[in-house]
Amino acid sequence: MPNNIILASKSKVRKDILEKNNIACDVKPSNVDEDMVKESLLNEKASPEIISKNLAELKANKVSSNNHEKIVLGADSVIDLDGELISKPQHRKEALLILKKLNGKEHHLISSVCISKNGSMIWNYTDKAKLKMKNFTEQELEKYLTKISDNALYAYNVYQIEGEGRKL
């Protein structure tokens, strides 16, 4: 029997959160070109909160427009480090560079969620958390990346605070 809820994301973490809360859902990634949207919004001087909200809404609405009568959940998170938006790393070297940038510094994790039905948003929420990463040597950061392997490539903050990264 198909679910009435669709997660517009390929994020394993987001799916796990829903499952841990006994929320059954189907997964249908939106395939929104996040980099293009982000670049356009940055050119318009949009805040990190607006960027996160718009991406969550765009993802949910896109999947919702092709799945009428279903409730679609879209989400997005961005990292703001002193006005610089940190993007997902494309490879391990880039993940290490991001960790070095965040090392010992305060930064903000901005997360948004949007619920859409029939291609239109019916609810959204955005929140901001202040985080501070401890100081680590480059060797410690390398060791951490080895431990979490390719999982570092699936999160904006690289260190995935919901898992092993909470130790950072």
State where each predicted segment sits:
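GST superfamily/GST-like fold recognition
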Residues: 1-23, 95, 105, 128-168
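Generic enzyme active-site microenvironment
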Residues: 74
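Active-site-adjacent loop/tail segments of enzyme domains
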Residues: 77-107, 133
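Acidic/polar active-site rim loop that often engages polyanionic ligands
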Residues: 37-41, 80, 120-127
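Residue-level signal for short segments within beta-strands and strand-turn junctions
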Residues: 29, 81, 115-117
